[in-house]
Every structure is written in structure tokens, then in C-alpha cells.
Amino acid sequence: LTTKKNQEEAKVNETSNELASATSAAQEAKENKEKADKAVETLNKQISAIKNLTIPQLPQNVIDAYKAYLADDSDANKTALNDIIQKWFKNSKYDFGTAITEYSPEHQNIVIKDWSNKDIVLPIDDSEVDLDNLTDKQIEALSQYYALLSNNLQEQVWGSHHYIVTEEAVQGVKNIAKAYAEENKPYSSGHSYTALAKDGLDSIAWAGENMNFNNTLLGYGAYYSEAKETRKVRMSQLYREVYDSVISFITNDVHANFGHMKLMVGEKVPTNVRAVGVANSFTASNVGRMHFVEFKGRNAHFEYVKDEQTGDYHSKYVDDYYDTGIAKPLATPFDTSKMEDELTAAKAKQTTAN
């Protein structure tokens, strides 16, 4: 009787174990399918976003007015350029429009929920960014996005472009942004030549800087800002700051005699390649700046060269960082081929999970 009872208990235990094992396998299969579905969905969204990125297209009358102002920077030409830019941009497909807001009992403040123009496509990346410690990869991605936008604008105006992103530019702008943050000065203090000198590298030096306040990130000074509370944001939010800055350098630059537009778009047909780096700085006092720094070789200089045929001397710009191939362009993340390979692999996993 005891033996029979033990046999029955063993059979019950075996059945229970089989059931538990089957349940566990089913749960694991369900989780694997959910992961595979999520991976495919995310990659599809990212690829679509890159292929459909919103890149401002300047109409011919803006280009003509810009070149006219470069040729003759009279007040009349400056006003004419600004008027044409405002007419082009306001309520255009490149204008985010009006903030859609609502009151948040949780934050006891008004929060921005969306924007009236929902058709602008920016890069999608929900990964977290520590505003006090942007990684090299995050800085590289911001730099590449800016290079993509500004090179497109240069192509529209001049028919060629000159921005590249290099490892040195990424490190240089990272150190410069850190120096700005440590200075902890108000935005009104303007460009800091002390911070700009702290690139920390022997090979390069800053040649020009555009800068913009983190308006959207910091709630335009009137709305709730999660960045102020947590000092953390999503990468997509920093892409928005880059886009807003590019637009601002065109549409909100009359007060600076279009100096920001000149640095970004150029004042003549580009002939020399230039490395550019983009990083955000965030001070202890919650002042956020996006920095766009153009770099030259540390020892760049002009030399007087004799023309052997005429005997005349003329100046020649020499920059070993670019001329000798030290500056090596980093591959852009806005090429979807790698993502498409990842999507193929993700779809294979999805099929297996099904």
C-alpha cells in the first residue's frame, strides 16, 4: 500500500513538474515574442524617422536675399532678408507652431503636452541622457545630426558643403561644454573664451561657436521642466534642441547681424573641410546651452608662397590637421543600412518566436 501511495505521489509530482515546466516555457516564449515584436517596431520607427527626417529647405528668395546681404550688409538688405525669412518660416511645415499645454496636479504647474504642428520628423531615441555627463556616443550623435542639417543648408545655398564630425571634435566640444557648466554663469554672459580654450587637445582649437539656450528643455521659463528636477532627459529631447537651434540661427538672427547663420551656412562656397562638434552644457543653476563648435588645427596659419612663374607672393592657408589627413570623418548614424540589417535579424527572431 505504501509503495502504491509513493508511486501515485511521484506521478503527481512528475505531472506538476511537467505543468510548471510547460507554463515556464510558455511564459518565456511569450516574453521572447514581446521582445522580438518590440525590437521590430522600434527599428521600423527609427528607420522611417531617418528616411523622413525634416530638413529645412530654403526657398530661392531667401537664398538670394542672404547672398545680397553678404555682398552688401546695409540695414536695408538686413531688414529685407529678415522679412523674407519670417514670411517663409511662420506657420510653415518647419515651424513647430504653438505649444499645447495642460495643468498638471502632480507637478502643480503647466506642462507642454505637444505642439500644433505634429508633422515635423526628428530622430527617435528614448535612451536616457545625464545632462551632467553626456557620453561620447551621445555627443557624436548630436554632432552628426547638426552636420546633416547644416550641410544640407550649405548645399542649398552654395552647391557644396564642408562639415565633418571627427573624434577630436567630439572630445573637444565635450571638454568645452564641461568648462561652460563649471563656470556656472548666466546665459547673458555670452560666449566664454576661457571655456572655449579648454578643449583639452593638442591637435585642434576652436575656430567659431554658435550657441543657443535650451528653451524647450527648460519650459521657456514658464512651464514645468523635468530637466530642472532630475537633470536627465531623453536623447530625442536633445535632438529637438539641435533642430530648434538650427531654425533659430536663421529665423531669430537679425539682432546678431545674421552672424549665427553665417557660421552655419557659410559666407562663400566651401573649400576647406571643417570638423564640428555639438554638446549640451547644464550648469548647477539650471542654465542649459547647446554648443556648436567649429574646429581648426592647433597650428593652422597663413604662409606667404612665391609664385615661380610671376615671382609674386600670395598667402596660403595651411592646416596640418586637415591637410595631412589627421582629421578622419566618423561614419554617420543617419545611414540606415546598419539598422536595416538589424531589422532583418530582428524579424528572423520574431518569426522564430511566433
Q: Language-model features: where?
A:
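Surface-exposed intrinsically disordered loops and tails
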Residues: 70-78, 109-132, 217-244, 302-331
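Extended hydrophobic/Leu-rich segments
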Residues: 47-50, 55-58, 62-69, 77, ...
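Low-complexity, Gly/Ser/Thr/Pro-rich intrinsically disordered linker/tail segments
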Residues: 289-353
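Short, well-ordered surface patches within globular domains
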Residues: 56-207, 261, 267-288
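Long, non-membrane, amphipathic alpha-helices that form coiled-coils
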Residues: 1-55, 329-354
